UniProtKB/Swiss-Prot annotation:
<dbReference type="Pfam" id="PF02976">
    <property type="entry name" value="MutH"/>
</dbReference>
<keyword id="KW-0234">DNA repair</keyword>
<keyword id="KW-0227">DNA damage</keyword>
<keyword id="KW-0378">Hydrolase</keyword>
<dbReference type="InterPro" id="IPR011335">
    <property type="entry name" value="Restrct_endonuc-II-like"/>
</dbReference>
<keyword id="KW-0540">Nuclease</keyword>
<dbReference type="GO" id="GO:0006298">
    <property type="term" value="P:mismatch repair"/>
</dbReference>
<comment type="similarity">
    <text>Belongs to the MutH family.</text>
</comment>
<dbReference type="GO" id="GO:0005737">
    <property type="term" value="C:cytoplasm"/>
</dbReference>
<dbReference type="InterPro" id="IPR011337">
    <property type="entry name" value="DNA_rep_MutH/RE_typeII_Sau3AI"/>
</dbReference>
<dbReference type="GO" id="GO:0003677">
    <property type="term" value="F:DNA binding"/>
</dbReference>
<keyword id="KW-0963">Cytoplasm</keyword>
<dbReference type="InterPro" id="IPR004230">
    <property type="entry name" value="DNA_mismatch_repair_MutH"/>
</dbReference>
<dbReference type="GO" id="GO:0006304">
    <property type="term" value="P:DNA modification"/>
</dbReference>
<protein>
    <recommendedName>
        <fullName>DNA mismatch repair protein MutH</fullName>
    </recommendedName>
</protein>
<dbReference type="InterPro" id="IPR037057">
    <property type="entry name" value="DNA_rep_MutH/T2_RE_sf"/>
</dbReference>
<keyword id="KW-0255">Endonuclease</keyword>
Length: 223
């Protein structure tokens, strides 16, 4: 069922909290892979199916009619994020005139439904649990941090300084190659303004940033 309101979406997300991947997959008649080595997007697909997400692999938000993006957040036993979070691909060409205010990144992060999930690899996939959902909108300070990182990284792209981009740049968000392998190639702008072949780059939220979101939720959650 596709949720028609934020309340319906949150209610559906709360109804699957506490289930294991195996329990939810069996309910939806979805086969469970042994591990995620060849099925990296399986958990996201499972939760999208369970919650009625509409976007599929399109660039729009997962629940575009509600203005909500769905993000899974693998955490360890201490509740700390295990990996960075992919937001969107960076526009490496045809990017003149793009501002933070009309960027894909800002659009995707304007309202997020985070679903924490058990991510420790020693737990068999079928037995990993789904956590309680978190509705999140960036605070003014978080938006300032995201905008600052986005503008710094986009300046390097637009100015043809792709070779200067490293994962160390950015306070809360970084740019990293996005692709199944290093043979994935796209077009970008070279240092002399020419079009070159380069690796696709994606914006990723740092683990420290998503840990902050989790902590804020846990700090205000009633007992």
């Amino acid at each position: 069922m596709i949720p028609q309101t934020l309340e319906q979406l949150l209610s559906q997300a709360q109804s699957i909290a506490g289930l294991t991947f195996g329990e939810l997959a069996d309910e939806l008649h979805i086969p469970v892979p042994i591990d995620l080595k060849r099925d990296k997007g399986w958990v996201g697909m499972l939760l999208e199916r369970a919650l009625g997400a509409t976007a599929g692999s399109k660039a729009e938000q997962d629940f575009s009619h509600l203005g909500v993006e769905l993000k899974t957040l693998p955490i360890n036993a201490e509740g700390y994020p295990l990996e960075t979070t992919f937001v969107s691909l960076a526009p490496l060409v045809q990017n003149s005139g793009i501002k933070w205010e009309n960027s894909h990144v800002r659009h995707k992060l304007s309202c997020v439904l985070w679903i924490p999930i058990e991510g420790s690899r020693h737990i068999p996939l079928r037995e990993r649990h789904i956590g309680a959902p978190i509705f999140w909108k960036p605070t003014a300070e978080q938006e300032r941090q995201l905008k600052q990182d986005w503008e710094e990284l986009m300046d390097l792209i637009v100015l043809g300084k792709l070779e200067q981009i490293t994962a160390r740049i950015g306070e809360v968000m970084q740019l990293r190659p996005k692709g199944a392998n290093s043979r994935a190639v796209t077009k970008g702008i070279g240092k002399n303004g020419e079009i070159i072949d380069t690796l696709p780059l994606g914006f990723y939220l740092r683990k420290e940033f998503t840990a902050q979101i989790l902590k804020a939720f846990l700090d205000v959650k009633p007992l």
